C-alpha cells in the first residue's frame, strides 16, 4: 500500500497542460486539465469545495455583535436595524422585502434624526447581503481606512448602521430618514466559485426610496485578492467630492479617480498579492 496520505490526491494520469502557467495570473477556473474526457479528480474536488463555500457564504448568519465590538474599540457607534424580511428564507425568496426596513427600524432612525438635527454628509450602512462572510472579513478594515481619509477631509459620517437581511436599496430609505446628503452601503456580493468573500460598495447622492440602480455607483470586489481597501476608499471619496460638486450620482457620474497616483497598499494588507499580467511587468505570485 502507498504511504501517500489519502487527502493528497494526485492525478498522475492527467497530461501536462501548456496553459498551466496562466493560472498564476488569475483565480479563474482555467487550465484545469483533463483525464480522458473528464476533469482530473483534483479539479473536480476543488470545484465541489468552491461550490460548497459559496453556498455556505449565502447562508452564514450575520455576526453583527462581533463587528459592533470591533468598531466600539475604535470609538465608533453602531445602530442595529432589520429589513422587512423576517428571516433568511424570506430574504432569498422576496428580494423586495430586503429593500425596505421593518417598522421598528424605521422608527429608530426617525428618533435618531429628531435627536440629531442638521443632517450629515454620509450615512454609512453595513448589510449582510448575499455573503455575510465578506462583511465579517472586510467591513471593519475598509471602514477604518475610509474614516481616516474622510475625517481628514472634514466629512461628517453617521454611526455605522448595520442591517440584517438587507439588500442594496435599503440604504436609500436609511439615507432619506436620516436626512443624509449621501449614503454608502457595504454589502456582501453574490458569492462566486473563486470569491465567496467579495464586498461591494454602493454609493448614492440624495438618497430616497424608489431610486433604481442607475442612480448608484458601484465599487465591487473589495477584498485582499481584489480591490484593496485603500483604493476602494480613494474611489469612494472621489465620488463623494464629485457628487457634491455636480449633485448627481450613478450613470451620470463616472469614476475618473487617478488611481495610478495612489500607492497601492505597500503595507502587509496587500504586499503578498501584487502580480503582473500578459502586458505589464510585475512580480509573479509564488506557487
Swiss-Prot record:
A GO MF term: cobalamin binding
Keyword annotations of the record: Bacterial microcompartment, Cobalamin, Cobalt, Lyase
Pathway annotation from the record: Amine and polyamine degradation; ethanolamine degradation
Documented EC number(s): 4.3.1.7
Top-level lineage group: Bacteria
Top class in the EC scheme: lyase
One Gene Ontology term, aspect cellular component: ethanolamine degradation polyhedral organelle
Gene3D superfamilies linked: Ethanolamine ammonia-lyase light chain (EutC), Ethanolamine ammonia-lyase light chain (EutC), N-terminal domain
Function recorded in the entry: Catalyzes the deamination of various vicinal amino-alcohols to oxo compounds. Allows this organism to utilize ethanolamine as the sole source of nitrogen and carbon in the presence of external vitamin B12.
Entry similarity comment: Belongs to the EutC family.
Assembly behavior: The basic unit is a heterodimer which dimerizes to form tetramers. The heterotetramers trimerize; 6 large subunits form a core ring with 6 small subunits projecting outwards.
NCBIfam families named in the record: PRK05465.1
Name used for this protein in its record: Ethanolamine ammonia-lyase small subunit
Source organism per UniProt: Pseudomonas syringae pv. tomato (strain ATCC BAA-871 / DC3000)
Amino acid at each position: 500500500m502507498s504511504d501517500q496520505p489519502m487527502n493528497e490526491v494526485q492525478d498522475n494520469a492527467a497530461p501536462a497542460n501548456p496553459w498551466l502557467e496562466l493560472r498564476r495570473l488569475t483565480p479563474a477556473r482555467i487550465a484545469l486539465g483533463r483525464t480522458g474526457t473528464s476533469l482530473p479528480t483534483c479539479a473536480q474536488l476543488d470545484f465541489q469545495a468552491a461550490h460548497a463555500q459559496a453556498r455556505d457564504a449565502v447562508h452564514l448568519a450575520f455576526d453583527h455583535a462581533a463587528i459592533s465590538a470591533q468598531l466600539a474599540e475604535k470609538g465608533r457607534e453602531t445602530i442595529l436595524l432589520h429589513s422587512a424580511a423576517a428571516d433568511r428564507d424570506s430574504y432569498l425568496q422576496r428580494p423586495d422585502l430586503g429593500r425596505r426596513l421593518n417598522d421598528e427600524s424605521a422608527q429608530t432612525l426617525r428618533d435618531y434624526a429628531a435627536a440629531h438635527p442638521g443632517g450629515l454628509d454620509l450615512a454609512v450602512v453595513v448589510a449582510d447581503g448575499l455573503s455575510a462572510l465578506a462583511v465579517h472579513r472586510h467591513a471593519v478594515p475598509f471602514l477604518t481606512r475610509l474614516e481616516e481619509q474622510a475625517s481628514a477631509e472634514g466629512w461628517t459620517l453617521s454611526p455605522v448602521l448595520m442591517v440584517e437581511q438587507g439588500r442594496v436599496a435599503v440604504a436609500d430609505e436609511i439615507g432619506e430618514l436620516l436626512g443624509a446628503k449621501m449614503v454608502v452601503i457595504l454589502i456582501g456580493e453574490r458569492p462566486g466559485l473563486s470569491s465567496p468573500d467579495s464586498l461591494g460598495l454602493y454609493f448614492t447622492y440624495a438618497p430616497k426610496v424608489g431610486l433604481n440602480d442607475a442612480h448608484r455607483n458601484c465599487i465591487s470586489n473589495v477584498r485582499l485578492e481584489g480591490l484593496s481597501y485603500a483604493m476602494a476608499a480613494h474611489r469612494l471619496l472621489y465620488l463623494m467630492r464629485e457628487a457634491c460638486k455636480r449633485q448627481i450620482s450613478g450613470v451620470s457620474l463616472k469614476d475618473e479617480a487617478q488611481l495610478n497616483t495612489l500607492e497601492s497598499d505597500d503595507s502587509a494588507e496587500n504586499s503578498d498579492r501584487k502580480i503582473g499580467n500578459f502586458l505589464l511587468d510585475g512580480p509573479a505570485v509564488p506557487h
